[in-house]
């Protein structure tokens, strides 16, 4: 996966949408007006911590802006592993026009790659990282994907029925990468995965396994989902699992 990653220090991107390469006059502004406004929400307090990372997936150079100030604005090993798997198995997974929701989308790499591969993507995360997430998604998908990804707030375990009603929110895939680490919301994370899974939904979860809590979560995941280990990356300690909800 090293060939997909290059890190370079960059100044904060602060130009207008056209200066930053977002769009030309042919784009319908009203379609993306609120999205463009939302990119202003993310402003690192320490500009020295600001970086760009460059990736190559789906035949396109992808530029991700990050800040090390927030766990959710950094690309982690599970994300690159999941992107590689999606790219290598696009036809097998039937990603063209597939409906995908990503939990904990972070800096947006997985959602961007999924969109470039033809999927209809909903990228979700906590409110404090949505501005950066939206920025990266627009920067890398506008005018070059069939379906412009949607960015939405999702707090694990909260207001799920109200925000994502099962009657209208049906997904072929729920994606998650490096969402399991040392935090206190693992039960809510699992409950969210279960809630978003309907008959036919496949969960693809990639994670670097570091702590005992990671394996404890895996045990609970296996209780809720029929689980298959799809890939293991020894150099990064990342495991990629496929889960299909067990129905009583």
From Swiss-Prot:
Enzyme class label: transferase
GO MF annotation, one: protein-lysine N-methyltransferase activity
Pfam families: Methyltransf_16 (PF10294)
This protein's record includes keyword Transferase: yes
Enzyme Commission numbers on file: 2.1.1.-
UniProt tissue specificity: Specifically expressed in skeletal muscle.
Keyword set includes Cell membrane: no
Record's catalysed reaction(s): L-lysyl-[protein] + S-adenosyl-L-methionine = N(6)-methyl-L-lysyl-[protein] + S-adenosyl-L-homocysteine + H(+); N(6)-methyl-L-lysyl-[protein] + S-adenosyl-L-methionine = N(6),N(6)-dimethyl-L-lysyl-[protein] + S-adenosyl-L-homocysteine + H(+); N(6),N(6)-dimethyl-L-lysyl-[protein] + S-adenosyl-L-methionine = N(6),N(6),N(6)-trimethyl-L-lysyl-[protein] + S-adenosyl-L-homocysteine + H(+)
GO cellular component, one term: cytoplasm
Residues at which S-adenosyl-L-methionine binds: 76, 104-106, 125, 156
A Gene Ontology BP annotation from the UniProt entry: skeletal muscle tissue development
Keywords: Cytoplasm, Methyltransferase, Nucleus, S-adenosyl-L-methionine, Transferase
Location of this chain's protein in the cell: Nucleus; Cytoplasm
Assembly and oligomerization: Interacts with members of the heat shock protein 70 families; these proteins may possibly be methylation substrates for the enzyme.
Function: Protein-lysine N-methyltransferase using S-adenosyl-L-methionine as methyl donor. Mono-di and trimethylates 'Lys-943' of AARS1.
Family to which the UniProt record says this protein belongs: Belongs to the methyltransferase superfamily. METTL21 family.
Name of this chain's protein: Protein-lysine methyltransferase METTL21C
Species: Mus musculus (Mouse)
Organism phylogeny: Eukaryota, Metazoa, Chordata, Craniata, Vertebrata
Gene: Mettl21c
């Amino acid at each position: 996966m090293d060939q997909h990653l290059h890190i370079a220090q960059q100044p904060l991107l602060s130009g207008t949408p056209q200066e930053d390469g977002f769009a030309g006059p042919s784009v319908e502004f009203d379609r993306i007006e609120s999205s463009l406004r939302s990119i202003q929400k993310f402003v690192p307090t320490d500009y020295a911590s600001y970086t760009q990372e460059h990736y190559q997936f789906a035949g396109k150079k992808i530029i991700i802006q990050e800040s090390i100030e927030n766990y959710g604005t950094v690309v982690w090993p599970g994300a690159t592993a999941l992107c590689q798997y999606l790219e290598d198995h696009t036809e097998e997974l039937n990603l063209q026009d597939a409906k995908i929701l990503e939990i904990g989308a972070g800096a947006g790499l997985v959602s961007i790659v999924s969109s470039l591969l033809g999927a209809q993507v909903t990228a979700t995360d906590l409110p404090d990282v949505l501005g950066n997430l939206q920025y990266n998604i627009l920067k890398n998908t506008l005018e070059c994907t069939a379906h412009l990804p949607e960015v939405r707030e999702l707090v694990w375990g909260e207001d799920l029925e109200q925000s994502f009603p099962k009657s209208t929110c049906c997904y072929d895939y729920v994606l998650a990468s490096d969402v399991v680490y040392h935090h206190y919301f693992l039960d809510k994370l699992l409950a969210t995965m279960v809630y978003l899974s309907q008959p036919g939904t496949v969960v693809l979860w990639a994670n670097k396994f570091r702590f005992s809590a990671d394996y404890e979560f895996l045990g609970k995941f296996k209780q809720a989902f029929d689980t298959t280990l799809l890939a293991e990356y020894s150099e990064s300690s990342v495991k990629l699992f496929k889960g299909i909800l067990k129905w009583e």
